[in-house]
């Protein structure tokens, strides 16, 4: 599994990445410390592996791994090229699921790109950029399918579905909150690789040590 760590600049994404992977990626108190994505691979501890290996007399036991990708900070307007722009939305599109790091702590020594601490606003900022990016994907797909929809019943069905997804996103909702009505819809959705269709975990704090 490949997990992308995302969030606004300077919220602790690289710090979390280093904590998970022990990779030693640069982490500093200024926006866009990370430009190129950092990648780390972590094995998943599982006590059952040894038992299964012993039972089947396996010569080699290979644990599951998780690949973490520390992606540069997104800002308002990223889908239109602001900050470090679409390059990093593309990096998110390559992962299986999203870990969204949200700043909840107060510290005057740590810069916030929007000047104040507001976790709900920050979550909405990132979600909107993901939505805007997905809308561009949908609009391109709609333009393509429209060309064949009049002559192809399956294309016409997909076009109706695309319009439904587009309306859902335009209402400010993530694609993953949509209920698929049949197998065709599930199959179509899986081919679009929408950012808002990916599973997402919001990380807000770490225990004080």
Residues of each region from the PLM?
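Phosphate/Mg2+-binding loops and adjacent switch elements
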Residues: 79-201
